[in-house]
Amino acid sequence: YPWFKCRARDLFVSLPGLTLAVDEQDEFEDVMVTAEKAIREFISGEPSSYKIYEMEDPDVLLWAVWALQQYAKETSREQCRQKYGRLLEDIMDYIRSRKHDNLFLHENGLLYANGTEKAITWMNSTVNGRPVTPRTGYIVEVNSLWYNALRFIADLVREDGNVHLADELDAQAEVTGKS
């Protein structure tokens, strides 16, 4: 919907279908050039110089990982690792280091988010500036994306020889999966 501008969640959810599904790998990569810069600014705490909005929503980085996973399926895991491996590791480090302002990794392995004051998921309707459906806690789709990201990135880094990080991520996924 054009009236929403370029919202980060919508970008990453739709990117594989709009590009990879119609054999437009170059278009995917072109969009990711800008998206990667915006992600890096966000995780570095820098003000955004790109018109990709709502990057701070708790599920956005996980949707970015999912989009890159689709890229790996359509091209190759090796190509994904070469182009985006560092970005994927940096996203994972950002989340695991508890640097996100509204994404809290708890001891049970699940990610917790607070949506009391601001709509933070795809159910983002508001009335008088307040969420119609406030979503706070262990949001199911966020944690599904989290588990997926842990497993996908663990596999990629293991294939690249980083067995230590892969084992850490797999151990985290085991804890998350049991919760």
Identify what each model region corresponds to:
Residues 117-134:
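A short, charged helix-loop
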Residues 1-2, 130:
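Active-site flanking loop/helix segments enriched in acidic
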Residues 71, 130, 154-155:
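Amphipathic alpha-helical interaction segments
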Residues 96, 100-107, 147-179:
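Catalytic cores of carbohydrate-active enzymes
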Residues 5, 9-11, 15-120, 139-143, ...:
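Aromatic-rich carbohydrate-recognition surfaces in CAZymes
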Residues 78, 136, 163:
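Active-site oxyanion-binding pockets that recognize sulfate/phosphate
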